[in-house]
Amino acid sequence: MDLNQRKEKKGQHVGCCGSRTDLSADTVELIERMDRLAENQATASMSIVALPSSFQESNSSDRCRKYCSSDEDSDTCIHGSANASTNATTNSSTNATTTASINVRTSATTTASINVRTSATTTESTNSNTNATTTESTNSSTNATTTASINVRTSATTTESTNSNTSATTTESTDSNTSATTTESTDSNTSATTTASTNSSTNATTTASTNSSTNATTTESTNASAKEDANKDGNAEDNRFHPVTDINKESYKRKGSQMVLLERKKLKAQFPNTSENMNVLQFLGFRSDEIKHLFLYGIDIYFCPEGVFTQYGLCKGCQKMFELCVCWAGQKVSYRRMAWEALAVERMLRNDEEYKEYLEDIEPYHGDPVGYLKFFSVKRGEIYSQIQRNYAWYLAITRRRETISVLDSTRGKQGSQVFRMSGRQIKELYYKVWSNLRESKTEVLQYFLNWDEKKCREEWEAKDDTVFVEALEKVGVFQRLRSMTSAGLQGPQYVKLQFSRHHRQLRSRYELSLGMHLRDQLALGVTPSKVPHWTAFLSMLIGLFYNKTFRQKLEYLLEQISEVWLLPHWVDLANVEVLAADNTRVPLYMLMVAVHKELDSDDVPDGRFDIILLCRDSSREVGE
């Protein structure tokens, strides 16, 4: 077709198949001239850059298969291919110049030309569907370059390519929307370099290829959504958050040991009598005769609630790690023992609600008896004075043996028939209550706790203390006691262990008094009956101690006594003697049982005794 005919084709488009429409005649003429010039230049350069066909075939097939996959979207990389020459030819939709030509949508440089969809090298041209190079051919889904091909939206460098999800460089990584070349040529949609051409979906590098979900670099690749830190140890996270520090362990241990020794000396100076059998009352400054009656027998580690001074796997004496133990040789009284005794002293001064709040206040010291002792010792003088005030009446009764007379209690005489009863009547009532309990096989502790007449035959048939306690545990007495009363503020074994090794002195005194009970029964003219043995007797006192209704009534009627909040003090108080209305001496626990019976509305309507019936039955056998 001559030039005039081409001009007449004005307005035709140059499409991907070679047709030229929508272009002016001048443009068509210019294109034709450029085509001829390109053909001449290509012919001249063939002798310079053309490679043997065998070498090309080897590069384009064997080596490609060796390093790459044949999948439609796979990457193709060539190690042994030649670089593109200074001149490049393009197909019918590509512009090429000696130095550079620019198509409407394509950039071509001295070292490379790129079609919008096609890469072509010096020795081959690529049509709209296929790329062919001297060393590689690439279709619309495949890139072929001398050294690397990169996705349209991917960065490529001489030594690295990165796809849309991957950053990979030898020395640096670029993001998925940036083109980087050796020499910097950039098209609006395509990046082309001397060493890189871009296909629409594939990345290829000299030493590594990266698909849309794979990281590949010559030495390292970095994913765009991942953090990679490299260091000499290969673990940057550990080094950043746990820096390696060169610590002189021997020096550290020596310093720690010196601190422990210093703390040990301070504690020994603060509590100097721990080498003897010291208790917390001595530490507070009480005299020995006062300590005898305020002594906290029956108080041990089980007095403490669960979790208070009861951590396992630590030193039993100070509750510290063995490396930090502050106990010293020859120490007979541990700091933990003094701490639980100090806790018992605080219980002496508080009712149930106040003590519960106190336990919450000292929560930071629940695992630190040494720290609690320091806290306790700060108010040492204040605690001593408070005990002297609150327990003056108790020491007067138990230590000086001051007599309690029911007639001195105005509220008692006005509010209870028991306070107008003679000593004989009180004793008869006491024996009668026990006789009824024995006959009905009633559970003693539960009865005195809330007047509940549950049956427990095993308790009455027990031959020794162990069987007796097992019977109580079997019927759930201790569990109910903890759930219903302030016994829950102590350890779960506290009440149970009161029947074992505690109260030995009081037990001896009680068993010696059994002969007195026999003489009393003979003097009353009744057939002697069995009096309760020690375990049943202690069950009665424990039930009365945790019976809040009874306690409040007794303390209101008997004006000479006040509140006691420790079981040992209650048991000791119950064994003092009082003067009945006829000035006869009776143990206080007998008066307690009489008041308890009076409060039992089922047997004593309106809380009053029928004195006439009681006297009428005085000659009748009491007990078995």
From Swiss-Prot:
**Which intervals carry biased composition (Low complexity)?**
118-225
Task: Using the record for this protein, list the coiled-coil segments as residue ranges, or answer none.
Answer: none
For the region Disordered, what residue ranges are annotated?
113-249
Q: Where is the composition biased (Basic and acidic residues)?
A: 226-249
Listed GO CC annotations = cytoplasm
Recorded hits in InterPro entries, A to Z, give: RLR_Helicase
Protein known as: Putative uncharacterized protein YHR219W
